[in-house]
């Protein structure tokens, strides 16, 4: 974050490479932008999980700590975690921390009757304040645009559709159809013919003599250029729309085909996608989610299998590659834990996961509304609960993978264990019948204890009576003996 990367030093390069590569350390390049925090992970987005969980956990441990040196160490660790999360550039991490902290504070405020009204007032004030900030400040506008996005692809880019037919290629430019075809002249030159939707020929003007690029003499297609090209001895054409090249070749069997970035001739097929999210929502995750949603219907009962999202998600999304994440780049993750779980484990598997998470969260809320927070163990459990909250929220815009999942499930298990310890220690959630039975048992014991002195006194009186009777009998005998 401060421009000091240990892995870019000679020591760091030796640390992360094999001995056989030590003579080529100068050729080792790093793809991370300068000033980006990534620790030992290959993706800075994963830091939103790690430090998103650690920040609330360390804060709770600080509150529960008793010794000064413990608090000092926790403050240093908290500052370092905040710096790393800031350096990762992950907006979703900060949003998850803020949302998790808000829920945790509301849980604490709900412990008292009067504080509940304070919590309700804070919720209302927070909603109103968020709306005002989002619509009146540049900071709020940026946050709002990051979350909701700003555009749909068909509204942002002029090329909306492509059709590879037998006789031509039809490109839809701002709702205007442009037909492009070509023929091979006797001298071997490629002659391009352009028409509008009514079949009217469109004139062409040489725009670049060196590349033989032609512009179209029509205002509707002012951003379109065509170029005759040869692809390994195969004649074809390139159509440039907004500076992006789309290559087509005419074949004898299938007519016109699209030459995709992998160099394969295919019939262009429009990929199904949802319009639920804007393309740039959550740093272009909206487009990925739109492409994932149509796949969900296939996996209501049975998922595709672990780590098979890459095979299920349509990878012939050429518009997305051209305008959003680049050609020959493929989405291997859904960038949403729950959507990916649905694809890979099915709807029922996803509902089971969500149900398990909700069970822990609801039970934790019930516990920490009642438990004694003067105990250190209580703050440990509450910190683990807050950490799980942040992870569950951050997972809406991130993937749970082998880099982050072990830490989460470890904290989740610790949270469950601490919750059980607190329930047992403070006798929480005891049923009314059990309470009544305990009270009755205590009452019976008390009655027995109260009755014990009475019984003892009765026994003592009986004993005294017997002693008196015997003394009377003895005195009579003595009197008779005296008479004799």
Task: Show where each model-derived region lies.
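Intrinsically disordered, Lys/Arg-rich low-complexity segments
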Residues: 462, 467-482
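Membrane-interface anchor segments at the N-terminal boundary of transmembrane helices
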Residues: 48, 333-357
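Alpha-helical transmembrane segments of multi-pass inner-membrane proteins
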Residues: 1-229, 353-383, 388-396, 408-418, ...
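TM-adjacent membrane-interface loops and short helices in multi-pass inner/ER membrane proteins
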Residues: 43, 181-183, 252-331, 345-352
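Transmembrane signal-anchor helices characteristic of membrane glycosylation enzymes that use polyprenol
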Residues: 1, 127-136, 244-245, 254-256, ...
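Juxtamembrane membrane-water interface segments that cap and precede transmembrane helices
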Residues: 23-40, 287, 322-341
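Short, highly charged, low-complexity non-transmembrane loops/tails of multi-pass membrane proteins
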Residues: 430-444
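Membrane-interface capping segments at transmembrane-helix boundaries
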Residues: 420-430
